[in-house]
């Protein structure tokens, strides 16, 4: 029964209501100024859905209740958005040597990002707030969560 539920989660999070849908909207809106709410939508579907799938499937397989799975999903959404905003920041503040991929690619491709909408400092504050939200949500779950807290902090404060 758990495996079937996990397959459903994976199908939903990777399909048109998840990563594929987010990528489609992202491509369709290239070269257009995207308002923040639409950018949030794209990021939540692309990066957020990927993390939600991984984390919720893990919770299901560990025997979490439906309520706990919903909590994990909210936490993963916050982590995913923070991760993507950090990616936007690194695209303009890092180097190709550090990142291992070309920098300023969003600007070259005329893509709207948190940095282009809000500036680097506000984007950094958004990352911090979202990671704090994720950690707060984490500690509403049962069990020892120190490792997961450290993992969240590493994911959203990474330099590559």
Task: Locate predicted features.
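All-alpha prenyltransferase/terpene-synthase fold signal
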Residues: 1-160
């Amino acid at each position: 029964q758990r495996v079937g539920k996990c397959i459903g989660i994976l199908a939903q999070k990777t399909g048109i209501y998840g990563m594929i849908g987010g990528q489609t909207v992202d491509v369709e809106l290239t070269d257009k100024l995207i308002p923040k709410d639409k950018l949030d939508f794209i990021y939540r579907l692309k990066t957020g859905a990927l993390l939600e799938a991984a984390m919720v499937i893990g919770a299901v397989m560990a025997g979490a209740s439906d309520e706990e799975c919903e909590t994990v999903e909210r936490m993963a959404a916050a982590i995913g958005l923070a991760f993507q905003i950090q990616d936007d920041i690194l695209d303009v503040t890092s180097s190709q040597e550090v990142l291992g991929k070309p920098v300023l690619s969003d600007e070259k491709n005329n893509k709207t990002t948190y940095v282009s909408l809000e500036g680097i400092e506000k984007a950094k504050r958004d990352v911090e707030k979202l990671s704090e939200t994720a950690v707060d949500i984490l500690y509403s779950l049962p069990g020892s969560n120190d490792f997961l807290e450290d993992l969240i902090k590493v994911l959203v404060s990474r330099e590559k």
